[in-house]
Amino acid sequence: MQPGGTAGPEEAPMREAEAGPPQVGLSRPTCSLPASSPGPALPPGCVSRPDSGLPTTSLDSAPAQLPAALVDPQLPEAKLPRPSSGLTVASPGSAPALRWHLQAPNGLRSVGSSRPSLGLPAASAGPKRPEVGLSRPSSGLPAAFAGPSRPQVGLELGLEEQQVSLSGPSSILSAASPGAKLPRVSLSRPSSSCLPLASFSPAQPSSWLSAAFPGPAFDFWRPLQAQNLPSSGPLQARPRPRPHSGLSTPS
């Protein structure tokens, strides 16, 4: 080397050896697979899609290659037993009705039934009831029966009072009386020992009515009798003999 001069031709190879290998700018190709693929390592230089001959072990395509029996096992429909009870599919409650129909005794189903028991119809909504042949109770009572026939008793009393042929409103009083029940002995025809009806005037109420039917129901007749009393004395019977009655007037 000469001082103060340029480097000679021997110094150029020494500088290249100290600097190292020449950098061309080419990097080594990376052939590593993605981290999500758990398959075997491929040889370097194969950066394209994996070969079709290798078994696919990716997680997204696993359910497609698994057998159908392991993914979702289903029973074949041909092995399902159908109930042989004559029931249609559209009838609600067919399974409980079939169970009850099979458990019911034969005597209970055929009591009073004229038609043979063919199972439930298609429009049935519940279990079959035994055909016992029940109907409406024939009690003989009318449809509008609501209680004891009290108006009939009043009508009978009114008819009997009309047969006795009482004068005045006594028959209406006996039919519409709100008091206690009248004794049936007093409703019969008066015998000869009683006073005849012809001995009293038809305008005045019968005096034996208050005596034969004592009670609070006939208390309102007493003021009427008091108004009919004459001012001279007490009430007296006015005899009016009838020619065709054949009854003698009292002395």
From Swiss-Prot:
Matching Pfam families: DUF4705
Domain of life, source organism: Eukaryota
Region Disordered, residue ranges: 1-93, 107-152, 169-188, 224-251
InterPro entries: DUF4705 (IPR031572)
UniProt feature, compositional bias: Polar residues: 225-234
PANTHER family, per the entry: DUF4705 DOMAIN-CONTAINING PROTEIN
Protein name: Putative uncharacterized protein FLJ44672
